[in-house]
Amino acid sequence: MFDDLPPLSHQEQQRAVEEIQKLMAEGMSTAQAIKIIAEKIRAEHKAQSSK
């Protein structure tokens, strides 16, 4: 599941954790929140790589 995630800086990791926690505070399950943020990170990395 996480093999294709790009390496993240500490700041990027912290931002991802905060986004996951926000989704969970809104009632989303941990697994779903992680999935959404992981997909977002992959999409952002793919967009940056294709430039």
From Swiss-Prot:
Q: Which residues form the signal peptide?
A: none
Under the heading InterPro entries, the entry gives: UPF0181
**Highest taxon in the source lineage:** Bacteria
* Stored Pfam families: UPF0181
Q: What protein family is recorded? A: Belongs to the UPF0181 family.
Name of the protein this chain belongs to? UPF0181 protein VV2_0310
Q: Which organism is it from?
A: Vibrio vulnificus (strain CMCP6)
